[in-house]
């Protein structure tokens, strides 16, 4: 485990409060992100009283801070040709970390193009205090469910697994851009239980600017708690093909198109479940234990944060999942 990040925590604790909607501490002149003051160390520990010692408040805060220095411009042409330009805000340097073969081919330049900016400084900091609290409650609810080791209906047992119990499955999938490294396994690791070589490689591109870091050393997610939390935040903040990010859903940025509406997808917490584990938990009615467990955690954490979601579309029971 890494040593505590004392210096950084002193700064954070001095500024702690629930006023996370205020970004006055950050200025465009210094480009310093506002301190993540949505949750105190005591509150974090109270939410996860049985957590593994691996999962510390210090590691979570450092992951939030470090990722806030990264912004990625995602350009998609056609269905599946991508370019990622990663900017390190501390240096101002931008580097193309992914550009698919034929991305700039003449025939491909004629394809429809979409551009999306992923700014990790927006994690639970993009809106007013109440919206930010709801987003953090939703993030922690999904994390707690993924890593719980207790009885359904109790909400004190999140962050108890660093990796999934059964590590015999390597979770390998054909991927030309992010091929698996020989002999490595990509089973679920970290707070969001990141799985498959494609996700490991893509997360590595965004977090490190080098896909090989996590493809070659997937165990880093279970040995470095900061990286573990970074992968969870990455998954939360980053859209995939036509699937929006959970972040955009919770801040109200994502709105369903005609296809989404026809397939029952609506803004709200239920959509985050669809994004994370839709094929297993969604479009199967409302009597699905994992889905209801996530919903229970969400309502529990909202209460702890002094927030409400009165019009919560919490269920994904009638939503078609994404199959990619």
Where are each of the predicted segments found?
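Bacterial Sec-dependent N-terminal signal peptides
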Residues: 1-28
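Extracellular low-complexity, O-glycosylation-prone Ser/Thr/Pro/Gly-rich "stalks"
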Residues: 24-44, 48, 256-324
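Peptidoglycan-targeting cell-wall enzymes and recognition modules
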Residues: 26-238, 264-268, 272-275, 280
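Short, flexible/disordered secondary-structure transition segments
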Residues: 150, 154, 243, 309-312
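Short, well-ordered loop/turn and helix-capping segments at boundaries between secondary-structure elements
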Residues: 200, 238-242, 303-307
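Short clusters of hydrophobic/aromatic residues that line enzyme substrate/ligand-binding pockets
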Residues: 250
């Amino acid at each position: 485990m890494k040593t505590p990040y004392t210096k950084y925590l002193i700064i954070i604790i001095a500024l702690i409060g629930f006023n996370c909607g205020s970004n006055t501490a950050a200025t465009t002149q210094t480009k310093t992100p506002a301190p993540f003051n949505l949750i105190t160390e005591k509150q974090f520990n109270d939410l996860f009283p049985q957590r593994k010692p691996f999962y510390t408040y210090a590691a979570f805060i450092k992951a939030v801070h470090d990722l806030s220095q990264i912004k990625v411009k995602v350009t998609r042409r056609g269905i599946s040709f991508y370019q990622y330009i990663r900017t390190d805000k501390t240096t101002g340097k931008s580097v193309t970390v992914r550009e698919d073969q034929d991305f700039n081919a003449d025939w491909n330049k004629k394809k429809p193009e979409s551009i999306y900016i992923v700014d990790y400084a927006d994690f639970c900091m993009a809106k007013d205090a109440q919206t930010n609290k709801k987003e953090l409650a939703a993030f922690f609810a999904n994390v707690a469910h993924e890593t719980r080791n207790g009885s359904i209906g109790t909400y004190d047992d999140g962050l108890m697994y660093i990796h999934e119990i059964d590590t015999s499955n390597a979770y390998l999938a054909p991927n030309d851009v992010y091929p698996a490294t020989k002999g490595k396994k990509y089973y679920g690791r970290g707070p969001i239980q990141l799985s498959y070589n494609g996700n490991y490689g893509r997360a590595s591109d965004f977090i490190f600017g080098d896909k090989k870091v996590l493809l070659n050393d997937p165990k880093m997610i279970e040995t470095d708690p900061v990286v573990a939390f970074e992968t969870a935040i990455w998954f939360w903040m980053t859209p995939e093909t036509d699937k929006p990010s959970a972040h955009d859903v919770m801040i109200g940025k994502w709105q369903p198109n005609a296809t989404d509406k026809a397939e029952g997808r609506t803004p709200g917490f239920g959509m985050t479940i669809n994004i994370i584990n839709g094929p297993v938990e969604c479009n199967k009615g409302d009597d699905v234990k994992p889905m209801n467990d996530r919903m229970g955690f969400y309502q529990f954490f909202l209460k702890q944060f002094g927030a409400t979601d009165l019009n919560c579309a919490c269920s994904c029971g009638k939503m078609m999942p994404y199959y990619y």
